[in-house]
Amino acid sequence: MNEENLQADLNLSAEIKLYYDLFVPESAAGNSPLLIAVHGYGAHKRYMMREARLVAPKNFVIASVQGPHQHFRQTDDGYRIGFGWLTDHKAEESVALHHKFLLDLIDKLALENLIDRQRIFLYGFSQSCALNFRFAFTHPQIPKAVIGVSGGIPGDL
């Protein structure tokens, strides 16, 4: 086989849909703080919304975002779908997608006059802690605080 003519790792870009759930309190007045809840590996946006609503003050708008990488997880009675944020292959692309998701979401909610851009808080569990800290170090002007549960700061930061 002649390897001279092989072109490797070519790519095309494709649009994907990124999903989130949104809780807007009745008291929201266009200047509400925003808590962005980011689930851990194998979980989903509904789980993280439940957790976020337990910890967020009553006046917070909450957006619970879902990782783009789905997989099956075995349960006692079969399987369920879980989601993750990172892949081993070209992990930097997964990180960039997470950052773009959060930036686009913040822009959308601000344009809809739901949130105050000066009061953005990130709440992550496990795998997403590293992503949220990366986001905060890359965009230090955006989050007012980062809450990490059962996760840590990536070793390369």
PLM features: residue spans?
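An N-terminal hydrophobic leader/cap segment in hydrolases
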Residues: 1-10, 120-122, 127
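Serine-hydrolase catalytic machinery in alpha/beta-hydrolase-like enzymes
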Residues: 12-28, 32-115
